[in-house]
């Protein structure tokens, strides 16, 4: 029965990811004037967040039952994901409690920074979700963790380029 529940929980997680990522990415692009911001997306993003947490806990519970706590909890990929989710949760709360109020006052930089960290978490989290070959010690924790700053650096470079192109389009209408 658990072998059937595991892919169903994974499907639930993928659907929540897809719905959330679509609107998170659109909101991110709106910071650069690439698309129009739509406040209605916030509700969908929060709903997706909730379902990512619930489905993630379900996946962990099923993994613990199938593999046993000793094996499942010794997986460096699991702890990389836990670390990444912690960073994502902090960035989400930073967006809601700090960056969004600043954005409403016309200060975009806090939202750009927090949004870039959040988007990097979404992208690297998706990679870890499908990188089954790296599980159970096939890649050490340090190597798995090293991928996140690389993704964050890439997105930061992209953000700088988008910000520069926005400045050019404002200066040269």
Predicted regions and their residues:
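Polytopic transmembrane helical bundles with strong interfacial aromatic enrichment
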Residues: 1-173
